[in-house]
């Protein structure tokens, strides 16, 4: 027990230090007032992001390159937290961090599907790696090898032995039939959140209570956004809506998702689950602008 307490003390100190490095609203305003990208990056060099940007040469000062360097700071922060986390909670923290690898996997597969439209003078991997999260030694996917296959089916074969093998192998059949990555990406999302929820529920005592509340609240909003977007934009059937969402959460129940899938009024259901959201109907009138606001309400 003592080691667990000291472990939390160490990670708490580390996270508090990270909070102190966050940019203040005033700093964000000053940055947003920068006249051009070069001035913005120059200003960022005087913030905690500076050491990640200081190595950029003038001809490398592009928004994409700067964003990639800034991602390295987030990667270093996550890596530090993972390594300092108490043993019993480390699997949960690692799975949280794997969210970025999931994004990388989707980006790799999408790039393979669209590479034919790119400038042939630039190697595909050089284009793709600029948008990937720098997952470092934690990565389990052979991103470069996948991109260089130039074929989705061949890239999927390279995922054997990774945490994604069973999920992606099953969904790959539909990708081949429908010529779309949509069912595969949905399957990967669901698998990620199932595993994260399972890790939260493996914990005991106060750890479990807090993890279930935090992870469950994230899962609730994801589930709601999925079912609303699938219904509004993808026009999925009731059965598909249920299959493409999760039957558990913190406040959003399986019957809530099923009710939306069956045609119940979405706004009234949101208002019941989240009483503080009083303008759900107005937000849903224009989903394109309203859903992002609802997601962060």
Can you annotate each of these PLM segments?
Residues 1-297:
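N-terminal domain-start signal
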């Amino acid at each position: 027990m003592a080691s667990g307490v000291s472990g939390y003390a160490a990670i708490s100190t580390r996270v508090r230090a990270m909070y102190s490095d966050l940019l203040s609203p005033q700093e964000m305003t000053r940055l947003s007032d920068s006249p051009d990208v070069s001035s913005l990056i120059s200003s960022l060099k005087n913030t905690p992001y500076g050491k990640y940007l200081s190595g950029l040469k003038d001809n490398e000062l592009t928004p994409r390159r700067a964003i990639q360097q800034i991602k390295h700071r987030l990667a270093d922060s996550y890596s530090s937290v993972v390594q300092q986390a108490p043993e019993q909670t480390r699997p949960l923290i690692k799975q949280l961090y794997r969210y970025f690898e999931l994004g990388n996997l989707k980006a790799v597969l999408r790039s393979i599907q669209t590479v034919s439209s790119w400038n042939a003078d630039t190697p595909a991997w050089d284009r793709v790696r600029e948008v990937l999260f720098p997952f470092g030694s934690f990565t389990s996917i052979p991103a470069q090898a996948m991109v260089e296959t130039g074929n989705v089916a061949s890239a999927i074969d390279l995922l054997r032995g990774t945490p994604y093998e069973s999920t992606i192998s099953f969904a790959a059949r539909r990708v081949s039939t429908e010529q779309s990555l949509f069912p595969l990406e949905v399957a990967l999302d669901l698998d990620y959140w199932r595993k994260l929820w399972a890790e939260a529920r493996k914990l005991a005592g106060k750890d479990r209570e807090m993890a279930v509340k935090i992870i469950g609240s994230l899962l609730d909003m994801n589930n709601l956004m999925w079912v609303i977007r699938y219904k509004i934009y993808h026009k999925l059937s009731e059965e598909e809506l249920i299959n493409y969402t999760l039957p558990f959460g913190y406040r959003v129940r399986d019957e809530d998702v099923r009710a939306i899938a069956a045609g119940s009024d979405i706004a009234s259901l949101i208002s019941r689950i989240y009483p503080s959201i009083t303008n759900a109907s107005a937000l849903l009138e224009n989903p394109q602008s309203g859903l992002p606001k609802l997601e962060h309400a």
